[in-house]
C-alpha cells in the first residue's frame, strides 16, 4: 500500500511468491496490473509504502530496466559507467576495476574497446548488454529484469535473451523476469506468475501453465498468443467488461466482475 494525499492506496494485494535459486521466474499481466511496482518495491525503490519484503542479504538484487536508451548516463563513457558499481563496492584499485570491466564486457559479448565509447554510439541491444553487465558488477545473484527486450528490435531480442540464460548458467543467477509478451516468457522462464490488479492469480511451472492453465484470466491471456502457422486456428477467449481501477479494485476476487464463472460468494472471498 502507498500513502497518497487522499489516504492509503493498496496497489499490491497479499502477494507471496518464492524465486528459487538458479531459476527464471516470469511475472506476466497487462499494463497497470502491478508487475513493475512489485519488483521496484522488492528493490526498495518505493519508500512510501507499507508491507514486508523478506530476502536473503547475499542476493544483492539489481534491476535491468526496460529502456536501454534512458538507463545509461549519456555524459559518461561505458568504462566509467561499468566502474561505478565497483567503486560502490569499495574497490579502489583502478587497474583492477578496469580489468574487471574488460572481463565483464567479454562476458556480455562485447569487445573490451567498448569501454571507450559513449552510450549514444551503441545500439539498443549493446546498451542492454551494458545494463546487464552493470548489474552483475554489483556481484548480484538476483536480477530483476523489467521488460528487458520490449524496446529492442525483434532480431536482437533472441540474442539478449540467450545471453541472459547463458549468464544464468555460468554465474548461477536467479532472475525475476517481467513481461507482457507471453511468447518471450515461454522461451526463457522456468516458472510463471500471472498478475491481475495487484494479485497473483496463478503461478505454475512453464509447462503446466501453458498446457493446462487453471484461472480464466490466464486462459484468456494464452488464447491471445499469435500462432505463426496461418492454417492453425485458436479460439480466442474475449473477457467482457473494462478493467477496474487499480486504485479501487472490486472486493473479494478482483476478477469476479469479468469472470464467466462468477458466483455470489466471489464478491466477498478470494
Predicted regions located by residue number:
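Helix-to-loop junction immediately C-terminal to a conserved catalytic motif
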Residues: 43
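P-loop NTP-binding/switch modules centered on Walker-like glycine-rich loops
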Residues: 148, 152, 156-235
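The feature captures the beta-strand-to-loop junction immediately N-terminal to the Walker
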Residues: 28-30
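Charged, flexible cofactor/metal-binding loops and thiol motifs
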Residues: 3, 205-270
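Conserved ABC ATPase "signature" region
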Residues: 96-113, 222-223
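A short, proline-enriched helix->beta-strand linker immediately N-terminal to the Walker B motif
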Residues: 137-141
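Conserved ABC ATPase signature
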Residues: 118-122, 126
Amino acid at each position: 500500500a502507498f500513502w497518497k494525499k487522499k489516504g492509503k492506496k493498496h496497489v499490491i494485494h497479499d502477494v507471496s511468491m518464492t524465486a528459487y535459486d538458479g531459476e527464471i521466474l516470469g511475472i506476466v499481466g497487462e499494463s497497470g496490473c502491478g508487475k513493475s511496482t512489485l519488483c521496484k518495491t522488492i528493490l526498495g525503490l518505493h519508500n512510501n509504502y507499507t508491507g514486508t519484503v523478506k530476502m536473503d542479504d547475499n542476493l544483492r538484487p539489481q534491476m535491468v530496466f526496460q529502456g536501454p536508451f534512458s538507463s545509461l548516463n549519456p555524459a559518461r563513457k561505458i568504462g566509467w559507467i561499468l566502474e561505478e558499481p565497483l567503486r560502490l563496492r569499495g574497490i579502489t584499485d583502478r587497474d583492477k576495476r578496469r580489468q574487471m570491466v574488460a572481463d565483464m564486457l567479454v562476458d556480455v559479448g562485447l569487445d573490451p574497446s567498448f569501454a571507450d565509447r559513449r552510450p549514444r554510439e551503441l545500439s539498443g541491444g549493446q546498451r542492454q548488454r551494458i545494463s546487464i553487465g552493470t548489474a552483475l558488477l554489483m556481484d548480484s545473484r538476483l536480477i530483476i529484469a523489467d521488460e528487458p527486450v520490449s524496446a529492442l528490435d525483434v532480431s536482437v531480442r533472441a540474442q539478449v535473451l540467450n545471453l541472459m540464460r547463458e549468464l544464468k548458467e555460468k554465474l548461477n543467477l536467479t532472475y525475476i523476469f517481467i513481461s507482457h509478451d507471453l511468447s518471450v516468457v515461454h522461451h526463457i522462464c522456468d516458472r510463471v506468475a500471472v498478475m491481475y490488479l495487484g494479485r497473483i492469480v496463478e503461478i505454475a511451472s512453464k509447462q503446466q501453465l501453458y498446457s493446462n492453465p487453471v484461472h480464466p484470466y490466464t486462459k484468456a491471456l494464452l488464447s491471445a498468443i499469435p500462432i505463426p502457422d496461418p492454417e492453425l486456428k485458436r479460439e480466442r477467449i474475449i473477457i467482457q467488461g473494462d478493467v477496474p481501477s487499480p486504485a479501487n479494485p472490486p472486493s473479494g476476487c478482483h476478477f469476479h466482475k469479468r469472470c464467466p464463472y462468477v458466483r455470489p460468494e466471489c464478491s466477498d472471498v478470494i
